[in-house]
Amino acid sequence: MVDKFELPKWLLRGIEESFPLRNFDQTLSSKINDANKSKSKLRVKLGIDPTGTDIHLGHSILFKKLRAFQDNGHVAVLIIGDFTAQIGDPTGKNKTRVQLSEEEVKENSKTYLNQLGMGKSSDKSILDFDSEDRIEIRYNSEWLKNLNLNSIIELMGSATVSQMLAKEEFNKRYNSQTPIALHEFLYPLLQGYDSVAVNSDIELGGTDQKFNIAIGRDLQRHFKQEPQYGILLPILTGLDGIKKMSKSESNTVGLSEDSLSMYSKLEKVPDNIIPSYFELLTELDLTLLKDNNPRDLQRRMALEVTSLYHGKEEALRAQSNCEKLFLGLKEKVGEIPIISLKEIVFPVKFFYLLSSLNLFKSSSESKRSIKGGGVKIDSYKLVNPDLVFDSKEDLSGKILQIGKKIIKRFDN
């Protein structure tokens, strides 16, 4: 729930929830207003664990909101979880994560900061790295690697096992007798301690981070600090229109992708996710969603997002090139052999679908080809063989390409 009638417009857009509604008899909106009146700067924390090499549009929602705080005079406290990344956030995982090496985490951290625009002027970067009084980059190894056993025991003593088991992922694993490593219980406490270390006023996170942010509030209270507010933003649905945007689902748009790739992916998103992409990825007026056909909205949204990361001129060039490719394909679409979905029982896994259609000799061959990047649908390279298609409508009319030779069009 959000105190929607009071929050400033620049902050309100896209927020799913803010909590608590009151903190020491003060609302989040009044805290922001008081800070603005007194010209004091709020410390707004966003933590990222560099567990991969790419930042995608799903991540960008949080960075855009952090930038909004910067543009309104507050301090972005960007925490690079170089220590916690070696543990791995158990949120959304049904098994223990593989731990990363220190070198892997360091390399990933560099690529993250480059993608966020470090070294670029503020008008060309996602975060404002130019205004030194509005950015603070911290690595949580600064304080976490020096914690002694007494400090760790104090942290662990501030929470209970029942609290930890209230976390959805832990609860599911406990009930299904799937192992939970003890170090995983430490993760929310260490992330929460980050809030103590930087004395944050507000923490940003996805809706899946509410538990961890709440632990941060508890720890700040334990260490005699004023507890932070939490601001939660939605988890972006991926290009398939079904599952959350995730590299493992092959449904992402990376910030480092070239303009043509970015535009061509975005202009094909399913109709059901156009409104959320408009709201979360652009600053376009949401009234445009009324009385406009989906195709026009797709193009408008794709152009706006591509412009944000590549500039207007480059985005227009990508749009033009994409339309030329589309027209060329449209002329040939009647020549593409049709492959019928009539005999397929849905829902169906991607690898099984292809082997059932006799496009591969076996399921294992199908899996290998998909994992190797040899299969595309509507120009998207899908690398997850276990991707599930729920109905014929997910595929009907789409073009399947296997390698360079096999091109077919799905039909009901």
Swiss-Prot record:
Annotated catalysed reactions: tRNA(Tyr) + L-tyrosine + ATP = L-tyrosyl-tRNA(Tyr) + AMP + diphosphate + H(+)
Start and end residues of each S4 RNA-binding domain: 348-411
Location(s), subcellular: Cytoplasm
Motif ('HIGH' region): 50-59
UniProt keyword annotation of ATP-binding present: yes
Example GO BP: tyrosyl-tRNA aminoacylation
Alphabetized PROSITE patterns for the sequence: S4
Keywords: Aminoacyl-tRNA synthetase, ATP-binding, Cytoplasm, Ligase, Nucleotide-binding, Protein biosynthesis, Repeat, RNA-binding
GO CC, any one term: cytosol
Domain of life of the organism encoding this protein: Bacteria
Family: Belongs to the class-I aminoacyl-tRNA synthetase family. TyrS type 2 subfamily.
Subunit structure comment from the entry: Homodimer.
Role summary: Catalyzes the attachment of tyrosine to tRNA(Tyr) in a two-step reaction: tyrosine is first activated by ATP to form Tyr-AMP and then transferred to the acceptor end of tRNA(Tyr).
This protein's name: Tyrosine--tRNA ligase
Originating gene: tyrS
